[in-house]
Every structure is written in C-alpha cells, then in structure tokens.
C-alpha cells in the first residue's frame, strides 16, 4: 500500500474544555467589591528576621531610659529608701542588663533549636540559666 501525504488540519489544542461547576461559575460572575486592594503582607517570619538583623547591627539601647530608671528605683526602694543615682550609674546598669538579656536570649534560642523548634519557650530559658549556673 502506497503512502499518502498528510494534509495540515487545525488543532483544537488537545482535550475539549470541561464545564465549570456551579460554584466556580458563580464566583467568577460575581462583581468585585469596588476594586479594594489588600495591603501587602510579608510571609510569616520575614519581618522577624529583618528586625533581628537590624537590631544585631545597631548599638543603641532598646529599653527606654525612663521606664528602666523607674524600675531600678522601685527595686532599690526594697533595700534602702531615699537612694540617689547618678545618671551614668543608671546608664551603666542599663547597658549591662541589655547585654545580659541579649546573651540569655541567644542561649535560649540555641536551646530551642536543639529541641528542633523555632519558637523559644519558658523551658528553654530555664535550661539556658541552669547551664550557665544561675539559680532558678
């Protein structure tokens, strides 16, 4: 049997289009609500990582000065009334407190990562303090 030449035919692109479900059709035909655009949102964790990088780069104090000063004075009241503080003493206390807290949170984060978690918990802080030899 001799071969015959095939002629070009218009293709329909494969499968025939399926009928839409009633719910999809209703959703598509419903008018949009005035074209109000949703505000942009970053994926969970993106902003947190950005803040971590920003605060690790910075050197300024993160706790506000006046609330910290009030707290120091309130704690000192338990030991002796009418104590006076130099502003440099409060500043030195605040520097050391923030350095302590940052290192504690670093150790706490390592404990959480060791437990295959990304969220720090109370038990991580307890473990970090116990490993440091602090009381609790």
Curated annotation (Swiss-Prot):
Modified residues (N6,N6,N6-trimethyllysine): 5, 28, 37, 80
Effect of residue 80 to A/P/Q: Compromises telomeric silencing
Location of this chain's protein in the cell: Nucleus; Chromosome
Phosphoserine: residues carrying this PTM: 11
PROSITE patterns referenced in this protein's UniProt entry, alphabetically: HISTONE_H3_1 (PS00322), HISTONE_H3_2 (PS00959)
InterPro entries assigned to the protein according to its UniProt record, in alphabetical order: Histone-fold (IPR009072), Histone_H2A/H2B/H3 (IPR007125), Histone_H3/CENP-A (IPR000164)
UniProt-reported outcome of changing residue 11 to A: Impairs histone H3 phosphorylation and reduces transcription of some GCN5 regulated genes
Residue numbers carrying N6-malonyllysine: 57
Residues modified as N6-acetyllysine: 10, 15, 19, 24, 28, 37-38, 57, 65
Modification sites for N6-succinyllysine: 80
Modification type N6,N6-dimethyllysine: residues: 5, 15, 28, 37, 80
Biological processes annotated in GO: aerobic respiration; chromatin organization; global genome nucleotide-excision repair; intracellular copper ion homeostasis; nucleolar large rRNA transcription by RNA polymerase I; positive regulation of transcription by RNA polymerase I; regulation of DNA-templated transcription; rRNA transcription
One GO molecular-function entry: DNA binding
N6-crotonyllysine modification, residue list: 10
Positions of modified residues (N6-butyryllysine): 15, 19, 24, 28
Modified residue annotations for N6-propionyllysine: 24, 57
Chain segments carrying region Disordered: 1-43
Domain of life, source organism: Eukaryota
Residues modified to N6-methyllysine: 5, 10, 19, 24, 28, 37-38, 80
One GO cellular component term: RNA polymerase I upstream activating factor complex
Record's comment on post-translational modification: Phosphorylated by IPL1 to form H3S10ph in a cell cycle-dependent manner during mitosis and meiosis. H3S10ph is also formed by SNF1, promotes subsequent H3K14ac formation by GCN5, and is required for transcriptional activation through TBP recruitment to the promoters. Dephosphorylation is performed by GLC7.
Function comment: Core component of nucleosome. Nucleosomes wrap and compact DNA into chromatin, limiting DNA accessibility to the cellular machineries which require DNA as a template. Histones thereby play a central role in transcription regulation, DNA repair, DNA replication and chromosomal stability. DNA accessibility is regulated via a complex set of post-translational modifications of histones, also called histone code, and nucleosome remodeling.
Stated family: Belongs to the histone H3 family.
Quaternary data: The nucleosome is a histone octamer containing two molecules each of H2A, H2B, H3 and H4 assembled in one H3-H4 heterotetramer and two H2A-H2B heterodimers. The octamer wraps approximately 147 bp of DNA. Histone H3 is a component of the UAF (upstream activation factor) complex, which consists of UAF30, RRN5, RRN9, RRN10, and histones H3 and H4.
Note from the entry: Present with 213000 molecules/cell in log phase SD medium.
Name of the featured protein: Histone H3
Native source organism of the sequence: Saccharomyces cerevisiae (strain ATCC 204508 / S288c)
